[in-house]
């Protein structure tokens, strides 16, 4: 979360209170349940510890791959099972293709926003239950859909290119803490 990251901006990142409220409002508008998973402990133990350990060893970590592979997908599918859901969908810019009973992550339509590189570690079992609805759209198309649906506030949000738990992109400050 932003407090432990040293960020001065509460509204940065995918897990900000504003982002959670935006997701809840859309869920209410579209008539489906909004669930929040508290995976801070697992995230800290697995992703943040890995990140700091790798940096201290002089290596460049890729925490997003670990998070997607071991934290996010496991937690989402566990909750999906409890809710009786067969599939999960995320907002990643990527595609899942099935060829000869094997599942592959491939680049999304918008190559400037492609996130397939961060999804390579997801297991076959988990990929078989995953959908990426944004994978067949360009970012501008998504903005148009959001605007036409009355979500102008989402279109105006700035995009984040940083690691979610280092939202100011200040690794040095984060590692000191």
Residue ranges with predicted function:
Residues 1-120, 131, 140-142:
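ATP-dependent adenylation/nucleotidyltransferase module used to activate substrates
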Residues 114, 118-177:
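Contiguous mid-protein beta-loop-alpha structural module that forms a pocket-lining wall or clamp
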């Amino acid at each position: 979360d932003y407090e432990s990251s040293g960020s001065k901006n509460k509204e940065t990142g995918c897990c900000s209170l504003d982002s959670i409220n935006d997701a809840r409002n859309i869920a209410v508008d579209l008539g489906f349940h909004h669930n929040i998973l508290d995976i801070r402990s697992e995230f800290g133990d697995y992703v943040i510890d890995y990140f700091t350990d790798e940096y201290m060893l002089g290596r460049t970590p890729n925490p997003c791959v670990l998070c997607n592979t071991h934290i996010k997908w496991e937690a989402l599918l566990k909750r999906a099972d409890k809710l009786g859901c067969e599939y999960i969908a995320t907002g990643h810019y990527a595609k899942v293709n099935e060829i000869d009973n094997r599942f592959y992550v491939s680049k999304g339509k918008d190559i400037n926003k492609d996130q397939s590189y961060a999804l390579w570690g997801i297991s076959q079992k988990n990929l078989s239950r995953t959908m990426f609805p944004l994978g067949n759209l360009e970012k501008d198309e998504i903005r148009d859909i959001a605007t036409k649906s009355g979500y102008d506030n989402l279109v105006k949000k700035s995009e984040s290119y940083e690691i979610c738990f280092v939202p100011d992109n200040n690794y040095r400050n984060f590692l000191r803490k």
